[in-house]
């Protein structure tokens, strides 16, 4: 069991000021100065459980589903074009993906005014905590915990990759957990299609979990970047601290080469960028260290698996399917219970050069699919 204490002290939920709006169809709560307007199928207790640059997340009771859910308010969702596209992408992806180890979409709350809305409310399954919080805590984690977390992450990733999707932003805080140790992957705002050789734009994600091909600006990366991130997360789970906590781009590459060795010419064979190759060739030479000696307390089979995940050349990196079949996960692996996505996800909606109003309308349509009575 993972200890995940939530709610206010003593289990009592505070009552937040609220008013009924739009002819009784909506309730607007004042959550510590944040307006939170949701349909009347959402009822107290309502509790803020997180906040970020995007806005606020509250747990609230969904009377239709008869369960507590997490509702994320994305404030001023259309002020930034890229952020608006991310929101639409995440909604469409979550509606397409249906897997035990991927966070489940419960609702996109329809806005009261179709043309004049600026905030987007997305409801998902409610989880208790995330892997980042668990790693930072002083809670003991057994070998069984670590195996189970890794197995579920890879099981979910197999499904995601089979849908022709690369997550691109795997990190401990994007892996949600409940008290039963169930793990669900979330935050698909940066996800991309898996199209080899297609020029994919550079983007900013958490540097510590970024594969070498991304650090070297390779534009034709594959789902192997997610496997690298899993390797980094795996070691952080075992070691209770980040494996490559680079202060900046250059420092990140240095940390990689100090542990995993300076890339050889064959390691660099995937790179087309001559500037990147020249940069690597002038780096100080480091041999690849034996992970078993650097981390003597870590299970030898776990080290063997991580070693295959942290292969500098992505073409030689272990695949998710191969990782699931590795001896470290033998007691959990069951190919018959590791489903794939029956229909690949289509990113076609992004190819049309859609404008802000189109994005807004598409999000509204997504809300209507889930709430036809508001059409």
From Swiss-Prot:
Residues that, per the record, bind ATP: 49-57, 72
Alphabetical list of Gene3D superfamilies matching this protein: Phosphorylase Kinase, domain 1 (3.30.200.20), Transferase(Phosphotransferase) domain 1 (1.10.510.10)
InterPro entries assigned: Kinase-like_dom_sf, MAP_kinase, MAP_kinase_CS, Prot_kinase_dom, Protein_kinase_ATP_BS, Ser/Thr_kinase_AS
Cofactors that this protein relies on: Mg(2+)
Superkingdom of the source species: Eukaryota
GO MF annotation list: ATP binding; MAP kinase activity
PROSITE patterns, A to Z: MAPK, PROTEIN_KINASE_ATP, PROTEIN_KINASE_DOM, PROTEIN_KINASE_ST
Ranges of residues in domain Protein kinase: 43-329
GO biological process: response to UV-C; response to wounding
PTM comment, free text: Activated by wounding and UV-C in a cultivar-dependent manner; phosphorylated in cv. Pungchon but not in cv. Subicho.
Protein name stated in the entry: Mitogen-activated protein kinase 1
């Amino acid at each position: 069991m993972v200890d995940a204490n939530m709610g206010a002290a003593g289990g009592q939920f505070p009552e937040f000021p609220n008013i009924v709006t739009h002819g009784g169809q909506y309730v607007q709560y004042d959550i510590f100065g944040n307006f939170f307007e949701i349909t009347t199928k959402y009822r107290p207790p309502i509790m803020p459980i997180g906040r970020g640059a995007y806005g606020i997340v509250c747990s609230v009771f969904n009377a239709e589903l008869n369960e507590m859910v997490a509702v994320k308010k994305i404030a001023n969702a259309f002020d930034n074009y890229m952020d608006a596209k991310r929101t639409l992408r995440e909604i469409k992806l979550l509606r397409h993906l249906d897997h035990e180890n991927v966070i489940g979409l419960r609702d996109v709350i329809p806005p009261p005014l179709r043309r004049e809305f600026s905030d987007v409310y997305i409801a998902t399954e409610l989880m208790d905590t995330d892997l980042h919080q668990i790693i930072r805590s002083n809670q003991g984690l057994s070998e069984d915990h670590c195996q189970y977390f890794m197995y579920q992450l890879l099981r979910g990733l197999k499904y995601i990759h089979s849908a022709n999707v690369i997550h691109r932003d795997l990190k401990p805080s994007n892996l949600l957990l409940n008290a039963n140790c169930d793990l669900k992957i979330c935050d698909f705002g940066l996800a991309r299609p898996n199209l080899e050789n297609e020029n994919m734009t550079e983007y900013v994600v958490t540097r510590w979990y970024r594969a070498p091909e991304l650090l070297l600006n390779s534009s034709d990366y594959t789902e192997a970047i997610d496997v690298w991130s899993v390797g980094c997360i795996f070691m952080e789970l075992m070691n209770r601290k980040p494996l490559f906590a680079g202060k900046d781009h250059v420092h990140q590459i240095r940390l990689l080469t100090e542990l995993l060795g300076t890339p050889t010419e064959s390691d660099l064979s995937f790179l087309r960028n001559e500037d990147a190759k020249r940069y690597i060739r002038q780096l100080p030479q480091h041999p690849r260290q034996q992970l078993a000696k650097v981390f003597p307390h870590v299970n030898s089979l776990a080290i063997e698996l991580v070693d295959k995940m942290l292969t500098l050349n992505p073409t030689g990196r272990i695949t998710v399917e191969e990782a699931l079949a590795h001896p470290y996960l033998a007691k959990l692996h069951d190919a018959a219970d590791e489903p794939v996505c029956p229909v690949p996800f289509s990113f076609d909606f992004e190819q049309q050069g859609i404008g802000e109003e189109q994005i807004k309308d598409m999000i509204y349509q997504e809300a209507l699919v889930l709430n036809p009575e508001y059409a």
